[in-house]
């Protein structure tokens, strides 16, 4: 039986370069699946007040969920060898806060 997952579409837009320029504008959109409901995770991370502001909490939650889903799908990839031991410890710590 195939596991069901949530389907997402994420848009990333470059609004301003470090030098203050706004052109050329850049934007990309990606479709992806994730086994978690990411909006709920964002709210839980924000409620924990782990970061200076809600924007950082949102960035952390989105980055973590994108990264962790790829890591799960590619767990046998040698790139993740060192993380396979410590990442579950990190996730347990995060969930316990």
What are these regions (language model features)?
Residues 56-63:
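Short, well-ordered alpha-helical segments
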Residues 2-54, 74, 78-97:
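N-terminal intrinsically disordered, cationic/polar leader segments
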